[in-house]
Regions:
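Eukaryotic intrinsically disordered, low-complexity regulatory linkers and tails enriched in Ser/Thr/Pro
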Residues: 1-206
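Short beta-strand element of the conserved SAM-dependent methyltransferase core
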Residues: 131-133, 211, 244
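Short, highly charged, low-complexity non-transmembrane loops/tails of multi-pass membrane proteins
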Residues: 138-150, 213-220, 262, 271
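Acidic, Ser/Thr- and proline-rich intrinsically disordered linker/docking segments
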Residues: 140, 230, 234-276
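Short charge-dense sequence patches
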Residues: 179-187, 214-224, 258-260, 272
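Short, flexible active-site loop motifs that bind/organize anionic cofactors or intermediates
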Residues: 206, 222, 255
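Phosphoinositide-dependent membrane-docking surfaces
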Residues: 211, 216-218, 224-242
Length: 276
């Protein structure tokens, strides 16, 4: 659980991006169960069925987007908790169920699998956007103590490169073997893992860390993350890396050589965290 933090920010602005992505997520999830309902009322011709599905997705996306766009606090509230990852988890389970039911559900199962994977990606985008909006709200008006900009330490870069390369390699082999021996499960698994490996391959990303009285903010090109000081346990600083240990989740790692004022950063952390 995150500690309570004030988010007394102007929240009257509309947020069409968050609303639109959320609407697309919900629309993708609703398509498979809608098919039997449409067929039950007598719509069986492929073209008509396709138009009905497009209309359903469009309607759900539009309505959901309109409702959430005018309610920015929804994104802020979601971003304050780990429940922001729930949409992705639900969509992944949805895709798995769709795949497992292919033999009995036919086209509905196929759509559930592929649209579930699409919704999984959209759910991840929802989580990142919600976290970014929460971070913007909780850090608005706070006094900045210090900031630094640094990339990953060399050892962490190598680990990410090795793990990402291994995932890509295993996924490629899985797709090839699945195609040769007609193993659908192996093929689909490889197709899902292949792009996941590429997520780990980039190792040169530089992040900006901003220390405030409320906590530590991490700024990426497309996202912002906030950690209250009570969510961070300790820090360790040496000539290669600065490692900030979180109570839950992966550690925050920075290359020491990239930090302009190491002494100020160390003082800031020492005032608030224990030194390993």
């Amino acid at each position: 659980m995150r500690s309570a933090a004030s988010t007394d920010r102007g929240e009257t602005e509309s947020d069409p991006l968050f609303g639109g992505v959320s609407g697309a997520y919900l629309g993708s999830m609703l398509v498979p169960p809608v098919i039997p309902l449409i067929e039950r009322v007598g719509v069986t011709e492929a073209g008509t069925l396709y138009l009905a599905l497009i209309g359903t997705v469009g309607l759900v996306t539009t309505v959901t987007g309109w409702v959430l766009s005018s309610r920015p606090p929804v994104a802020v509230t979601l971003g304050a908790t780990r429940a922001r990852w729930l949409p992705s988890a639900i969509a992944f389970a949805y895709a798995v169920i769709g795949f497992a039911s292919l033999e009995t559900t036919g086209v509905v199962g196929v759509l559930a699998f592929f649209l579930g994977l699409l919704a999984f990606l959209l759910g991840g985008a929802i989580a990142v956007m919600a976290q970014t909006r929460y971070t913007a709200a909780v850090t608005a008006g706070t006094e900045e103590v210090t900031r630094w900009r640094a990339s990953w330490p060399e050892s962490a870069r190598r680990r990410r490169l090795y793990v990402g390369g291994a995932v890509v390699g295993v996924a490629a082999v899985g797709v090839a073997v699945g195609a040769v021996f007609d193993l659908a499960l192996l093929q689909y698994t490889g197709q899902v893992l292949f792009p996941s490996g590429f997520v780990l391959l980039p190792t040169g990303g530089t992040r900006t860390a901003v220390a405030t009285e409320r906590g530590l903010e991490i700024r990426l090109p497309v996202a912002r993350w906030f950690y209250a000081w009570n969510e961070l346990e300790s820090y360790d600083l040496d000539s290669e890396s600065l490692v900030i240990t979180r109570r839950w989740g992966s550690d925050l790692r920075f290359a020491t050589a990239d930090i302009d004022d190491v002494s100020l950063v160390e003082w800031t952390l020492a005032e608030r965290l224990s030194d390993d």
